[in-house]
Amino acid sequence: MSMFFMFGIGWFLIVSVCLWLSLLYSCGVGCCWLVGDKVFSGLFVFDSVSFYLVILVLILGFYSQVMFFGLLSTQVRFFLVVSMVFAVLCFCINHSVIFWCVYELSMFPLLYLIFSESPYSERFLASWYFSGYLLSTSLPLILILLYLSYVNGSFFFNEWGYGCNVSLSIFYVLSFVFFTKVPLVPFHTWLPIVHAESTSIVSIFLSGYIMKLGLLGVYRSTFFVFDLTFVGYLFVCCLVAIGFLVTACSELDGKRWLAFLSLSHIVIPFLGFFVSDWISIGYSFFYCLGHGLSAALVFGLLWCFYDVSNTRNLVLLKSGIGGVVSMVIVVFSMLSLCSFPTTIQFFCEVYLVSQCSGLLFYLLFWVCYLFFGGLVPLILCGHLLIRSEYYEFVCVSYHCYYFFLCFLVFWCYFAIVVL
């Protein structure tokens, strides 16, 4: 089926209104100059955090549904849309029980797609890993949310607070339940396995917005626990994040390589919880937007290379570079993982580094993270480009990949201008 469509004036108006509303709302990180920085309606809350995460889902959802219309079956597209709808609701829900429902329901469609659509032999092992973490934490999560709702006398997150004879350990347990979905150490083992055994479109959505659901849950319900009493866990996460970057150097599977990089990158917004105030906390989730776009871009690139060269081995991937266009896309994709200017991650990391000035531990972490985080993608980029024997080819079947990647490159590097 052809991937080229004629869009009428209706589509043009819809896209124009969405872009106009995004410009109207964002006006910088965490700022809404017409209606204030938050919009409450009891059941729903729409703030800068919701805005950036919803934008992430809409970008990934729209471009994947349009560009891969001929590659994805109707069943796959349906389950992806279901997951996106529940994720958007989760980002904007203020009610604890409904939040739990849409939080869990946003992941189940992707779990089903791993079972049903993955062509890899170990997909059942990966599915059991994912479902194990998903189901084992589901019951404790709803029980804790119900208990805190009862103690605080309200189901709405914005009316919760520390007190009311609630032990701080309850909030710590709730935080770790959410950490399993991010995932942070020691709950990280499922992510490389699931990425390696799932289809590329599922990997795009997993790294795109599923990893951010846990951070959102922590922000909504346990935002007040991140103080000096919790900094020991942050210290462990930072050390392990550097270890993930080193581990990525030994990976030959492209998807596992990127999964370990994502495990390292996701520590940055968690660090932002400790060094940011209420005004600047939006930078952590603005970083999530940049990370989601960058991860989706590189997973899409690996998908394209897999179709061209029939391998995910990083040593052999250079055979998939078929000309100047693919070479340019490779360069921009790898640089997005390095937080290269003018990516969203670059500006967020600059701000977070400035917030960490004067704190020796944070500065040491940033030195190691920025060095290895920039070096690892550049090594792969150099390997793919140096002494590469490629031939120029033009094949209509690959245009959908190139358009998808070009659109994501635009958002990775120029979203800071639009948003």
Where are the language model's segments positioned?
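Core, highly hydrophobic multi-pass alpha-helical transmembrane subunits of bioenergetic inner membranes
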Residues: 1-419
